[in-house]
Every structure is written in C-alpha cells, then in structure tokens.
C-alpha cells in the first residue's frame, strides 16, 4: 500500500524545475535540495568509484523510499517520477545507504560507470501551507548523471557478469582501468593479454602495461597497434568466502579507426515521455 501511495504522490507532482548544476569527477560531498527555490539540484559524475550524499530538508519525505537493500532500491528515470527502475539495473554496482533513519540523507556509491550515460532522479516531497489558500504539495529534488567513460578511461571493472569497453587507436594513446572490490587482474603478467574470446592468452604487442599511483592499470601504445581486440579479466578471489564465480571483462579495441562498442549487459528501461506541467 505504501508503494502505491508513493507512486501516486510522485505522479501527482508533475512540474518543470529550474536547475542548479554542479559538474564533478569523483564526488565526495553532500548535494542539498533547494526547497526555497524548488530547484532540481544536479550532479554529473565522470569517473568510477565516486560517492555522493543527497540531503532532503527535514520537513520533506525522500522518494523513492529507502528500502535498506541495494538490490531492491528504486530510482526515478524521469524528472516527473513517472518511470522507475531498480538502482542496480539502471547503474550496475551502485549502492544506496541511509546512515540514520531519522535523517533525510542518502549516500550513493558508483563503483563502475555505465556503458551509456544515465540520469536518475530523486524527490524531496513536502506540504506547504499558504495563508487563505490551504496547503499544496511542494517539492525539490536531485538529478544525478553518470557519464559513459571515453575510450581512454578511466573506468573500473567491478560488477561480476558485466563488460567494460575501452579503446586505443594510435601511437602514444593510453587507456586506464582498474579491477574493483576483491577482483584481481588476469593475466597477471604485464606482457600477456587474452584475445577477444577472453580465454586464449597471447603476448601483448605494440602496447605496454603499467600501473599508476592510483592502482589503475595503464595501457600505452608504443607504436600504432594492429587492429584487434584485447581482453583482460577481473576475477574473484576463489579463497574468499561467498565469492562470485563470474568475472568482469575488460575489452579494449586497438588499432587505427577502432571504437569500443557500447553494449549494456543489464537492460535499462527506456523512460516514457510524458508532457510536463508547471508545478504551482
């Protein structure tokens, strides 16, 4: 019943928000809902392993409701809240956490960027009393956009069963990625790589693999590489209790004219397009 009420409230509040935009790379801050001006506070995240805290005013209700389980937590796919999706379906690997049930704050983590840019929305819903006019619904909210990584990265391979795609075209080009969580890179030898089938090991040619100070693996083209696709696997540690048997795959298209093919492993529901009415 609570879920039905939530949907009804979200659909009732249909509006055009002015925007308060903030562009970030690896966020670790709090985004405040602008209740006074009823603005949509926005954040753009362009690097993996980012953290963002969303704070609704104390007099409002955070929507979608916090479930306490990242697997069931939902988000809005449209600004008006008419379309919803599970958080981890829209943004693989993302988590949501509420430190205190008495606060209207939610902390989001985004370990891995999506294959295609994705925006999710949250609302802060309350009631405003107007002298002589009764009350009306008031709302502010958040729009959080995760951008798809460019061919050169950086990107993180974190979610078992998914694939990230990067690219190197010419001499001197680089691409950066890391294995997140407890996942370990395979092949381990710096001069080895898998073919596109992700199972046949071969020597790494025309490319050099190194590691930067942030524990990202860096592939650099020492000369213009032949056109092909390389694969690395981020594998779970079999000694870890309860480990996932699935790998996260890193496909790297190399050679002049190569472009990584964007393909989402998880289906993302397409937002329905509805007419937006002014909120008054």
From Swiss-Prot:
Domain of life: Eukaryota
InterPro entries: SRS_dom (IPR007226), SRS_dom_sf (IPR036755)
UniProt keyword annotations, A-Z: Cell membrane, Glycoprotein, GPI-anchor, Lipoprotein, Membrane, Signal
Signal sequence coordinates: 1-23
Post-translational modification: The N-terminus is blocked.
Sites carrying sugar chains: 26
UniProt-recorded name of the protein: Merozoite 31 kDa surface antigen
Lineage: Eukaryota, Sar, Alveolata, Apicomplexa, Conoidasida
